[in-house]
Amino acid sequence: MATKKSGGSSSNGRDSRGRRLGVKKFGSEKVIPGNIIIRQRGTKYHPGRNVGIGKDHTIFSKVSGVVYFRKGALNKTFVDVLEVNSAS
């Protein structure tokens, strides 16, 4: 009798989910303290005025204001939060 053992299932065919990185608040958007502005791996964007950086390089707002992106020395991109006057 000619028989053939059935093939086993492949050990491939899986992948991990995306990490949801990127810019969360774009330029001219309003933020409050603690808002995450960018989630990133490494410092593609650097912290500027009124923002902090977490241990996983997440950039977050320290004050209420408006997000502003600018180019600095050596073509680095900095993220600032510019405080808006509450008098208006």
From Swiss-Prot:
Keyword Ribosomal protein in annotation: yes
Pfam families from the UniProt entry: Ribosomal_L27
A Gene Ontology molecular function term of the record: structural constituent of ribosome
Any Gene Ontology biological process: translation
InterPro entries for the chain: Ribosomal_bL27, Ribosomal_bL27_CS
GO cellular component: ribonucleoprotein complex; ribosome
Region (Disordered): 1-24
Domain of life according to the entry: Bacteria
Bias kind Low complexity: ranges: 1-13
Alphabetic keyword roster: Ribonucleoprotein, Ribosomal protein
Annotated transmembrane regions: none
Listed SUPFAM superfamilies: Ribosomal L27 protein-like
Family: Belongs to the bacterial ribosomal protein bL27 family.
Alphabetized PANTHER family for the sequence: LARGE RIBOSOMAL SUBUNIT PROTEIN BL27M (PTHR15893:SF0), RIBOSOMAL PROTEIN L27 (PTHR15893)
Protein name in UniProt: Large ribosomal subunit protein bL27
Organism listed in the record: Ehrlichia ruminantium (strain Gardel)
Lineage: Bacteria, Pseudomonadati, Pseudomonadota, Alphaproteobacteria, Rickettsiales
Gene label: rpmA
